[in-house]
Structures are given as C-alpha cells and as structure tokens.
C-alpha cells in the first residue's frame, strides 16, 4: 500500500487550503493509499538556529517535533502539501519546516557526498496553494521555494493546484469545482503510487 504524508501548513484549521487538502486526502484514500495527516500549527518546531549541529552527522541537533515529521516524510512514497500565500511565499509554518530540512541537504552534500539512495521518481508530491490577490506573479516565489524544497526531499512535483482570489475562511466553498479538482488530484496520485491506471 502506498504511503502518503499530507502536510497542512495553514494557520487556520478550516481555511481554504485546509479544505482543499482534505479533499485531496479523501481522494488518495479512495485510491487505496495510506495517508497520514500532519498539521504543522499543532507541532512544536523551532526555526533553524543555524548552529550547524548537523554538520557531522546530517541530523538536526534541535530536539523537537521536527524529527518525527522528517521520519514520516522519509518513509513516504508521496506527499500532499498545502500552504496559503503569505507575502508571495509559503506560510511561516511551512517555511520553518523547509529551513529545518537544511540538515537533509547537509547529509546529502557534506556527510554522504552522494545523492540519496531514494529514487526521486518514486516520491511524488502534490502541492496546493491559495492566494488572496489575482496577480500574475502571485505564485512565482512560492513555486521557486517548493522546487528546491522537494529537491532536498528527493521528491518530484507531480501536480500543482494554484488558486487566486480567495482570502476569507470559507471562500473555497463558493468554488465546488476546486474541491472536486483537489479530490481528483489526490486520487490520481494515490493510483499512480499504487501502480494502477487512472480511471477514464
């Protein structure tokens, strides 16, 4: 059974990104995947202190919930990640997780001095993001960060769902087609990871 980790990076429990991710999770489970949900706002994860306690081992020296999250990510075949846009970047919750994954970069490039043994093609990620404005470059910064974050996680971007013009909690409910699209994307990821074909 394919294992997927779903990461909720919004500070709101019932926000638009959370609602979309819930649909993606439902779709992945419908496809037969084992999905574990992680709500970053509920965890105690310190920002990176740049003390390079990871320099010799590739393991972060800070003792908090990051270690548990990383362990789950490393065991996953797929990732579902959702974050709102804050100042043309990801939420603070996700940015902290990204920065703490510097220890992975250190492990790969300083300690092992070789790429991870994990096949990058095997771990796939679906990324969902919602922004309030309708600017053409709204997602440029966030996608650049995600590209390099997923590279550190030895993951490839399977699909992105980017939605503009939603700011207040519940706005996504006015767009049922977005929720349907998110569920379909989660289902598709689950099927692909399970080695199955997508239903027509």
Give the label of every model feature segment:
Residues 1-106, 168-200:
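N-terminal beta1-alpha1-beta2 submodule of the flavodoxin-like/Rossmannoid cofactor-binding fold
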Residues 159-164:
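Beta-strand-loop-alpha "switch" segments that mediate conformational coupling across diverse proteins
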Residues 106-158:
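Short, glycine-/small-residue-rich phosphate/pyrophosphate-handling segment
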Residues 9, 130-133, 166:
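A broad detector of the eukaryotic-type serine/threonine protein kinase catalytic domain
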């Amino acid at each position: 059974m394919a294992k997927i980790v779903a990461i909720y990076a919004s500070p709101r429990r019932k926000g638009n990104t959370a609602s979309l991710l819930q649909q993606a999770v439902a779709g992945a489970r419908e496809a037969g995947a084992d999905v574990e949900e992680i709500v970053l706002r509920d965890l105690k994860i310190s920002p990176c202190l740049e003390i390079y306690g990871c320099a010799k081992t590739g393991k972060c020296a800070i003792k908090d919930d990051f270690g548990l999250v990383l362990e789950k990510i490393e065991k996953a075949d797929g990732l579902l990640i959702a974050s709102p846009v804050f100042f043309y970047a990801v939420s603070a919750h996700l940015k902290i997780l990204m920065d703490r994954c510097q220890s992975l970069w250190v492990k790969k490039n300083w300690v092992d001095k070789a790429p991870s043994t994990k096949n990058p093609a095997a771990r796939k990620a679906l990324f969902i993001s919602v922004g309030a404005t309708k600017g053409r470059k709204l997602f440029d910064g966030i996608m650049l960060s995600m590209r390099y974050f997923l590279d550190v996680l030895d993951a490839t971007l399977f699909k992105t769902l980017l939605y503009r013009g939603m700011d207040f909690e519940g706005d996504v409910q006015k767009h049922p087609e977005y929720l349907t699209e998110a569920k379909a994307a989660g289902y598709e990821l689950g099927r692909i990871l399970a080695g199955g074909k997508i239903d027509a």
